[in-house]
């Protein structure tokens, strides 16, 4: 996978967490934002044992499964989201969670799979907007679809522009956010960054969350485009504005790695591991340790990455296996 796609996909995962209403599910949301996916799933499952039709619990369980990074459980997430829609057809957020689960299934299955699911993904997000015009997450999700999907799959700039304009009439600040997303998608990163930073979400926690997500996205895109100084600057701004953010330290470390600043990168990766113990972080640590000539530590890091049965990209897994053999040989 190209570096741009990898980094932006990583940032997009962060956006999975905003489909629950903060006012009605703050405990769940705290667990998800802290990447405590097993705990969130257990809490949701416990709730469902008592209230089988609980929309919040079904949404949280769906997002916890997706957030875990276990690709083999994506169909389970889709099924849970479908049950949410069936039990709560008028719940906007159930439809959004289904769109996200189908999106994960499509991304995991490749281009042909994406084409097959595109219509259902789009329709789920559109239904979310239709049922609740003030659902910011539904609007952001639909905008992401329009930006990412080509016209033949139901996306396109004209639809994205129309959505941003219509959103501005309902939720002005959200309209500005969607326009910033459109600008970022068109490569106008400085303009997008300025608009995102200038947003005034007030007490709207959901809009605050998406402001954070999109600012991370701009920083990650700078890094992916090899504009490392700009990427670091934006991501450090994220750390100042949103101290609990999970993604900024990883993005900064990746920028440092790409510049050969491996000692600095290791500090950031270690910080990331404290909050996000994922296989790709161990893999990146292995790369930096190897570059510094610390063979034994590099092998240990690669082996930690390989110990995860799921969640490590095929290319990374293959490379980690090759590097371990070479380092031990």
Please describe what each predicted stretch is.
Residues 33, 67-70, 104, 148-149, ...:
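Register position in tetratricopeptide repeats
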Residues 52, 89, 133, 170-172, ...:
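Short coil turns that delineate tetratricopeptide repeat
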Residues 144, 208-275:
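Alpha-helical adaptor scaffolds
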Residues 56, 63, 93, 100, ...:
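Start-of-helix register in tetratricopeptide repeats
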Residues 60-63, 97, 141, 178, ...:
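Canonical tetratricopeptide repeat
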């Amino acid at each position: 996978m190209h570096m741009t796609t990898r980094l932006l996909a990583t940032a997009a995962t962060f956006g999975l967490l905003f489909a629950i209403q903060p006012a009605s599910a703050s405990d769940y949301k705290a667990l998800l934002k802290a990447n405590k996916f097993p705990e969130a799933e257990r809490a949701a499952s416990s709730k469902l044992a008592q209230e089988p039709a609980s929309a919040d619990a079904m949404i949280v369980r769906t997002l916890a499964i997706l957030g875990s990074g276990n690709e083999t459980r994506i169909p389970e997430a889709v099924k849970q989201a479908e049950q949410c829609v069936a039990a709560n057809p008028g719940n906007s957020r159930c439809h959004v969670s289904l769109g996200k689960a189908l999106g994960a299934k499509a991304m995991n299955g490749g281009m042909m799979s994406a084409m097959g699911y595109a219509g259902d993904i789009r329709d789920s997000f559109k239904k979310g907007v239709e049922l609740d015009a003030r659902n910011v997450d539904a609007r952001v999700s639909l905008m992401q679809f329009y930006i990412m999907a080509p016209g033949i799959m139901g996306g396109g700039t004209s639809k994205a522009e129309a959505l941003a304009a219509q959103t501005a009439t309902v939720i002005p600040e959200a309209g500005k956010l969607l326009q910033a997303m459109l600008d970022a998608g068109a490569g106008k990163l400085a303009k997008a960054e300025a608009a995102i930073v200038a947003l005034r979400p007030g007490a709207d926690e959901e809009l605050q969350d998406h402001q954070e997500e999109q600012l991370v996205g701009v920083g990650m895109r700078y890094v992916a485009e090899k504009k490392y100084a700009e990427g670091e600057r934006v991501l450090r701004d994220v750390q100042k504005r949103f101290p609990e953010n999970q993604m900024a330290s990883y993005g900064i470390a990746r920028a440092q790695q790409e510049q050969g600043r491996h000692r600095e990168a290791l500090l950031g990766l270690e910080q990331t591991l404290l909050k996000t113990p994922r296989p790709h972080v161990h893999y990146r640590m292995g790369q930096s340790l190897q570059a510094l000539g610390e063979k034994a530590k590099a092998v240990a890091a690669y082996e930690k990455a390989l110990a995860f049965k799921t969640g490590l990209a095929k290319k990374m897994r293959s490379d980690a296996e090759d590097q371990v053999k070479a380092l031990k040989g």
